[in-house]
């Protein structure tokens, strides 16, 4: 799933480690989400959206439309 986490994180000057601490996940998890290798759970996606004060759909974009 495409997302804008890396860009949003950079705008705030946050490292992957800092974001990981705020979300209570590993830095590797943040990296995997940013690079699209891992899709976050719904609760984690909501936590990310809350931290960045944006709706989920403004951060996450599915690779393809559902059928």
Residue spans of the language-model regions?
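Short basic helix-loop element that most often maps to the first helix and adjoining turn
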Residues: 3-22
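Recognition helix of helix-turn-helix/homeodomain-like DNA-binding domains
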Residues: 25-38
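Key DNA-contact positions within bacterial/archaeal DNA-binding proteins
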Residues: 17, 28, 57
């Amino acid at each position: 799933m495409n997302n804008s986490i890396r860009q949003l994180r950079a705008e705030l000057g946050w490292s992957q480690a800092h974001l990981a601490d705020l979300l209570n996940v590993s830095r590797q998890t943040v990296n995997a989400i940013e690079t699209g290798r891992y899709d976050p759970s719904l609760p984690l996606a909501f936590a990310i959206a809350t931290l960045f004060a944006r709706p989920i759909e403004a951060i996450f974009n599915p690779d393809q439309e559902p059928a």
